Amino acid sequence: MHHDPNPFDEGNADDNPFSNGGGGGGGGGSRQQYGFRPTEPAGFGAGRGDATVDVPLDTMGDSKSKARELSSWETDLKRREADIKRREEALRNAGVPMEDKNWPPFFPIIHHDIANEIPANLQKLQYLAFASWLGIVLCLSWNFIAVIVCWIKEGDSKLFFLATIYALLGIPLSYLIWYRPLYRAMRTNSAFSFGWFFLCYLIHIGFCIIAAIAPPIVFHGKSLTGILAAIDTFSEHVIIGIFYFVGFALFCLETLLSIGVLQRVYMYFRGNK
């Protein structure tokens, strides 16, 4: 009867791969060298059959839906951008000026480009009128500061309320009712714009004269830094009086500058009529 050899029989050192007999580490040529590779960790592809990862179908569906939405938004944005460019091009072809906000440079809120939109012979006069508008902005801003100092010292809330109204209404209204019409008149030579400017600018000059005087019968107490309010305040509080005298000087300078602008614009309008 044939007996199968026992693979675990230590008697046959040549067949036992774990035997160190005889030759130690460097065995003879008759011995077969067995190489070992490190065992692979059990994981994907190990064991009975290959393991699979189940991806929820609803997740895949949501991803596809989001991709479609993003694609739709992108298409819509491109369409709107093309439509805006087409309208701008149509306006340019029709001769309508495109007014992009560019002033002040750090926070553009208005369009202002004297160098490119006003004729060269009128640019100096327009810059002078622009200085007049900046002057009333400075006057009303300083008036607000001076009245705030007086309000803190005396505690009259009406002063604070009126000074706030002067600043919040006076600055934007001065731009809208007389500076912007003059800018338009210089650019288009519109007689109507010139007429509107003259009317509103006379009101502006009248306000500056009254503010420089600050009579208590017109404005409440010390809500304007005119000469009368400055003298009254200086006799009580020197520091506050200095604030008021500075405001008085600013209103005087603004009045003189505005009168000069009015004369020059009127001379140009009469000569160009």
Swiss-Prot record:
<keyword id="KW-1133">Transmembrane helix</keyword>
<keyword id="KW-1003">Cell membrane</keyword>
<dbReference type="GO" id="GO:0032588">
    <property type="term" value="C:trans-Golgi network membrane"/>
</dbReference>
<keyword id="KW-0472">Membrane</keyword>
<dbReference type="Pfam" id="PF04144">
    <property type="entry name" value="SCAMP"/>
</dbReference>
<feature type="topological domain" description="Cytoplasmic">
    <location>
        <begin position="1"/>
        <end position="131"/>
    </location>
</feature>
<protein>
    <recommendedName>
        <fullName>Secretory carrier-associated membrane protein 6</fullName>
    </recommendedName>
</protein>
<feature type="transmembrane region" description="Helical">
    <location>
        <begin position="239"/>
        <end position="259"/>
    </location>
</feature>
<comment type="function">
    <text>Probably involved in membrane trafficking.</text>
</comment>
<dbReference type="GO" id="GO:0030658">
    <property type="term" value="C:transport vesicle membrane"/>
</dbReference>
<feature type="transmembrane region" description="Helical">
    <location>
        <begin position="194"/>
        <end position="214"/>
    </location>
</feature>
<feature type="transmembrane region" description="Helical">
    <location>
        <begin position="132"/>
        <end position="152"/>
    </location>
</feature>
<dbReference type="InterPro" id="IPR007273">
    <property type="entry name" value="SCAMP"/>
</dbReference>
<dbReference type="GO" id="GO:0015031">
    <property type="term" value="P:protein transport"/>
</dbReference>
<feature type="coiled-coil region">
    <location>
        <begin position="68"/>
        <end position="94"/>
    </location>
</feature>
<keyword id="KW-0813">Transport</keyword>
<feature type="topological domain" description="Cytoplasmic">
    <location>
        <begin position="260"/>
        <end position="273"/>
    </location>
</feature>
<feature type="transmembrane region" description="Helical">
    <location>
        <begin position="159"/>
        <end position="179"/>
    </location>
</feature>
<feature type="region of interest" description="Disordered">
    <location>
        <begin position="1"/>
        <end position="69"/>
    </location>
</feature>
<keyword id="KW-0175">Coiled coil</keyword>
<dbReference type="GO" id="GO:0005886">
    <property type="term" value="C:plasma membrane"/>
</dbReference>
<feature type="compositionally biased region" description="Gly residues">
    <location>
        <begin position="20"/>
        <end position="30"/>
    </location>
</feature>
<keyword id="KW-0812">Transmembrane</keyword>
<comment type="similarity">
    <text>Belongs to the SCAMP family.</text>
</comment>
<dbReference type="GO" id="GO:0055038">
    <property type="term" value="C:recycling endosome membrane"/>
</dbReference>
<keyword id="KW-0968">Cytoplasmic vesicle</keyword>
